[in-house]
Amino acid sequence: MLTSKEKSDTKRLPMMPIRDVVIFPYMMTPFVVGRESSVRALEEAMAGDKKIFLATQHDASIDEPKPNEIYSVGTIVNIVQSLKLPDGNIKVLVEGVERAKVVSVADDEGFFRATVRTSGFKVETGPQLDALISRVTTLFEQYVKLSQNLNYETMVAAIRVDEPGKLADTVGANLQLTIEEKQELLEIFDPIDRLTRVAEMLDIEIEKLNVDRTIQGRVKRQMEKAQKEYYLNEKIKAIQKELGRGEKSEIDELKRRIEEAGMTADAQEKAMAELKRLENMPPMSAESTVSRNYLDWLLAVPWKKKSKEIRDLKFAEGVLEADHYGLEKIKERILEFLAVRRLVKNPKGSILCFVGPPGVGKTSLGMSIAKATGRKFVRMSLGGVRDEAEVRGHRRTYIGALPGQIIQMMKKAGTRNPVFMLDEVDKMSMDFRGDPSAALLEVLDPEQNFMFVDHYLDVEYDLSQVFFVATANVMHTIPAALQDRMEVIRLSGYTELEKMEIAKRFLVKKQIEATGLDSKQIDFQDDGINSLIQYYTREAGVRNLEREIGNVCRKVARQVVNAESGKDKKAPAKAVINGDKVPELLGPWKFRDLVVEKKNEIGAATGLAWTEVGGQLLTVECTLMEGKGKLTITGKLGEVMQESAQAAMSYIRSRAMSLGIPRDFYRNLDLHIHIPEGAIPKDGPSAGITLATTICSALTKIPVRGDLAMTGEITLRGKVLPIGGLKEKLMAAHRHGILEAIMPKENEKDLPDIPDAIKKTMKLHFVESMDEVLKIALEREIVALPIPGAELPVEAGKPAEETVAH
């Protein structure tokens, strides 16, 4: 263990505060004295034994520090030399003698006089001390070699010192430390502790210098590389100049391409101006890269190239029939468009919007249109887009700016007249960066899109030859102004017969090929496909049907592989997929026919609803409890549906006696109406007659027919108003096995849109009033109650207009 013994002494000396420097013992330091108090202290020392106590002040900005603003530990120094300067200041050279700690300070005729205590330590030598001295010496050698601020003589002088205290002070004085770190070292009186601390500081400083040297080396290499590249580029330019080629030829090539691009006059003028700027720029500058990118984009966009259109209606009809089954209205509209193109020389592009549930073929229709017309096809997905710059691009002032997706897709198409699909146009949103749907207003307006301006290109670009096709699941999320610019064509879901044909013509072949099978290994029969449609999928489109066909094919593929490897010797040579085989492969049915076990029930009726995924059945339940006429409505219903329930309740109360219900029934009863699947939001007025029928059934105790569905809005006077989505609703009823439906009389005009398969198999009742609804929907006829005081009895089936006043 390293040890040292202390002996102390007290002295009284003139004191001088110093700034931005810490004086160590054995250290020769010159500095200038200018403060009046410091000059007096210096003169006092010079008049005596030339010894003065120097201590660093805490804050160098203070001109006349107080004793408590000066560090308490400083150094007693000898004044070696003193020289008075012409400006009145004194330049002195001092040598540190020993460190001392202030005991007390007195103000003595304009300067400080301090009583200080010195501490002398006697160090016991030994191998541990020798090892510490050797370590510090070695570290200091490394430090001097790494540092550019110390010379070799300093290192030699330090190495020759064998006294630990003197070595610590010599090394500490030469380290690049802060004032605080040097003061900390000065305040350590024990030489062994001080030397140990110096060793720690040397380790840290060497690490810093190593990191600094690594960084400097990396920077130097990069600079050398940049200088080398610059030199080589200049040399290449000189060689090319000598050969008569080079940058000039590149500028000439760009100029030729601009002239041949077929740009508008405005765009060509802007391109030429940018080319002139590029010519005057240094080739290695960042701005030249920006200009070059801009010119590349201007030249990449198709200005005059057009696809040669196919205007043969028979060919187009054949393509559409081959790719899609059904969808007659859409096919007619596309063929009408082609007929117009054939008759008119320069017609404007069309803007169609396909609206329908998922999986009915909206996106694939766009590809078929491109194929039928001989045009290129590009697709831009708008789902989740909420930045206007996605459509119009960023201005060139931004770093990394690019054109918007419209221009990027036109570049991808390579022609002025592609079929441009704007997919999921109903799923755009907006935020602080703008509204992309507002940017689309210009794109989809035939009166404006011939001069569409992208923020990046900043020139007018003609989109009038583009055939725009938008797709959406619902219309209500699309802004009205955008709806107004598009011709909306609605795609309903497919009937079971249509799904059967689609599966046989397209899906089965596609999945057999995708799984590596062939017609010799698997055979889908009609009852097998029908089983998949009825019991494993329940959708408006055919996506899930294709998925289930794929599941069957994969399971058969596994059986084929096992049979070939000898693992499954019982596997048949050809898998026949029929109604019995499907459950073996896919497990139990996922969906059951809801009507098979459904009986007529009191207070429960089946309604029809329309959602963005197609038509759906809606069960409405009503129950009675003792109470005071409170109406509770549950099932996550929207405001419109809740108001429909209130209207239905008011109608029942106003017609209570004629419906066989006591007039004051509500005084003693509470009604609770519930629509199951409470987690799913429901809204709309079309459940009005279903709600009224359910309430009437619960109050009269007459069951509602279970094999019947209904839809229609109700008024307070009992009239039945028309609804929307009739085709989808009837298809949902047909899909669930319900073959009888009640609907408003005014919806009879929609019958031509209903598939023939549904009209032939379903019995449709068109009604005008609730009385007609109740006659059809309830199991038996209502018997009216006699009205007290009335001359004539009220008959059941009384017209809805004659309401009872309360």
UniProtKB/Swiss-Prot annotation:
Job of this protein: ATP-dependent serine protease that mediates the selective degradation of mutant and abnormal proteins as well as certain short-lived regulatory proteins. Required for cellular homeostasis and for survival from DNA damage and developmental changes induced by stress. Degrades polypeptides processively to yield small peptide fragments that are 5 to 10 amino acids long. Binds to DNA in a double-stranded, site-specific manner.
Active site (record annotation): 686, 729
Entry annotated with the keyword Transcription: no
Expression induction: By heat shock.
Keyword annotations: ATP-binding, Cytoplasm, Hydrolase, Nucleotide-binding, Protease, Serine protease, Stress response
Annotated InterPro entries: AAA+_ATPase, ATPase_AAA_core, Lon_bac, Lon_bac/euk-typ, Lon_lid, Lon_proteolytic, Lon_Prtase, Lon_prtase_N
Protein name: Lon protease
EC number: 3.4.21.53
EC supergroup of this enzyme: hydrolase
Main subcellular localisation: cytoplasm
Organism, as annotated: Solibacter usitatus (strain Ellin6076)
Family stated for the protein in its record: Belongs to the peptidase S16 family.
GO terms of biological process kind: cellular response to heat; protein quality control for misfolded or incompletely synthesized proteins
Residues given in the record as ATP binding sites: 356-363
Annotated Lon N-terminal domain residues: 13-206
PROSITE patterns listed in its UniProt record: LON_N, LON_PROTEOLYTIC, LON_SER
Subunit structure as annotated in this protein's UniProt entry: Homohexamer. Organized in a ring with a central cavity.
Subcellular location field: Cytoplasm
